[in-house]
Amino acid sequence: MGAYPFFGVPISTLNDKVQQAELFFGEQVREIRNEIVQKENVKDKFKIIETWFLQMLDESKTAPQELVEVLSKLQNQPFSKHNELLKDYPKTQKHLIQQFKKYCGLTPKAMHRIFRFNKLLEIINHKKEIIWTDIVYETGYADQSHFIKDFRNFCGFNPSIYIKNGYNESTPNFFSLDKEG
């Protein structure tokens, strides 16, 4: 779970920062880059990266099982109240937040919001007729304003523009960074 077992530092310390890959991976990162560039097949490129990451994995730094279980609950139940999903965690809420930041770089609430938004896009992308109020309540939002605020925070524009520009049909989960659509 998370990148901590690969980097060896709490991932939250890297949030909102641009870091040189050499700081974490040494000169080997240049060699890996050169190998990737030489491959034409995408599968071959990913195989190089996968092999490299598996070599870097420090099994002693993997997430505790109870943390993996919480993450799994958040992912599998994206429309539930996140506090309900966290109540069975055996330690304090502060400890849970610290562990999430260490392994994932985010709080449990932020992860849950991401999972909910991804599931929301999946629902929108598969609906032929979209009735926003139904979607708002189906996805666990208190009201339409919270739904629109979350949508705008994640993709930069409101849900109507997402539909108007056909992102739900042409390129699900990929949309223009141009806020005008």
Give the role of each language-model region:
Residues 1-83, 89-93, 107, 125, ...:
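Alpha-helical bundle regulatory/interaction domains
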Residues 112-113, 163-164:
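Short Lys/Arg-enriched helix C-cap and helix-to-coil transition segments
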Residues 100-108, 151-159:
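HTH DNA-binding helix-turn interface
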